[in-house]
Amino acid sequence: MTEYTPKERLYRALRKQPVDRMPAVCFTQTATVEQMEASGAYWPEAHADAEKMATLAEAGHTVIGFEAVRVPFDITAEAELFGCGIKAGDLKQQPSVIKHVVKNMEDMEKLKGYSLNEGRVGLILEAIKILSEKYGKELPIIGSMIGPFSLAQHINGDAWFGNLFTGEEIVPALLDFCSDFNVAYAKAMVENGADTIAIIDPTASYELIGGEFYEKYALPYQKKIVDAMKELDVGTVLHICGNTTNGLSIMDKTGVNGISVDQRVDIKTATDNVENAIIIGNLDPVAILWNGTPEDVAEASKKVLDVGVGLLSPGCGIVSMTPSANLQKMVECAKNYKY
């Protein structure tokens, strides 16, 4: 069989086309302290400096062996663009949202008139361009963003789930706004060199909102992004945290190329329940990748591969203290696997 470049290999794998072997990629957060030390680009500075962001993302390839580069390393830049307060994080902890900006319909005015060139969103686009210019012919360039449901929750804060259950008008208004932003942001990522988009939508979890609410308040807004990317022939992967087993068939309706699943999801059940997307996952990022040994990683990888996972990957974002040796073993297991 033809030997493909990493870029060609992932393109084909996400579309269920034959490939020579499994791509070794990660669609969730990739940075670790050991990569920071090797590259000289550290958190929290790398969250807010395009050159450092690109340098640290590059370390996922040069240090670990991932056959793609991915930015950013958190899911708060979008909320920050709209005025939410952000705790910057530190060497080991990612940034987090600590202040929300929309309480009612009148507050929606605060969100208008944004520019994708401003703030960390603009820096992420710049980092994508840097990575694309260096690696774009050979490696997949993955642009990652928070999904519309979780972005709306970041903007609305603790009131979000209450508003959801009481059917407040702020809910569809925010979801329309956020998904329109997501589409514009994804298109800007592609314009700057991204060829694959990862949508991270943790609070849209089946465990939190159930199937009925997911189908009403998450599915159509995620699908809006996917449809826009399909028009550009850009692959999409959706990651939602928690045990999403019972919601996977609904998630598949988004039309994404890949569904990234949490370590609590049974891979065999997932592959049986999902008709269109490939299943991505789902090594435990804490018990196996952070606290395990390379031997543990190899054993866990074999179990996941044996039941037919589409792409071997962590079940969630990589913990910053994860040893490089464990991630390198995961990469090795993926590269050695032929479908």
Swiss-Prot record:
Q: Does the keyword Transcription regulation apply?
A: no
Q: In which pathway does it act?
A: One-carbon metabolism; methanogenesis from methylated amine
**Gene Ontology biological process:** methane biosynthetic process from dimethylamine; methylation; one-carbon metabolic process; porphyrin-containing compound biosynthetic process
Annotated CDD domains: Mta_CmuA_like
Q: Which Pfam families match?
A: URO-D
Q: Which InterPro entries match?
A: Methanogen_methyltrans, Methylcob_mtaseMtbA, Mtase_MtaA_CmuA, UROD/MetE-like_sf, Uroporphyrinogen_deCOase
Q: Does the keyword Metal-binding apply?
A: yes
**What EC identifiers does the entry list?**
2.1.1.247
Q: Which reactions are catalysed by this chain?
A: methyl-Co(III)-[methylamine-specific corrinoid protein] + coenzyme M = Co(I)-[methylamine-specific corrinoid protein] + methyl-coenzyme M + H(+)
Q: Which domain of life is it from?
A: Archaea
GO molecular-function terms, A-Z = [methyl-Co(III) methylamine-specific corrinoid protein]:coenzyme M methyltransferase activity; dimethylamine methyltransferase activity; metal ion binding; uroporphyrinogen decarboxylase activity
Q: Which residues bind Zn(2+)?
A: H239, C241, C316
Q: Keywords in UniProt for this one?
A: Metal-binding, Methanogenesis, Methyltransferase, Transferase, Zinc
The protein's required cofactor(s) are namely:
Zn(2+)
Which protein family is it in? Belongs to the uroporphyrinogen decarboxylase family. MtbA/MtaA subfamily.
Function, in words: Methyltransferase involved in methanogenesis from methylamines methanol pathway. Catalyzes the transfer of the methyl group from the methylated corrinoid protein MtmC (MtmC1 or MtmC2) to coenzyme M, forming the substrate for coenzyme-B sulfoethylthiotransferase.
Q: Which NCBIfam families match?
A: methylcob_mtaseMtbA, mtaA_cmuA, PRK06252.1
Q: What is this protein called?
A: Methylcobamide:CoM methyltransferase MtbA
Q: Which gene encodes it?
A: mtbA
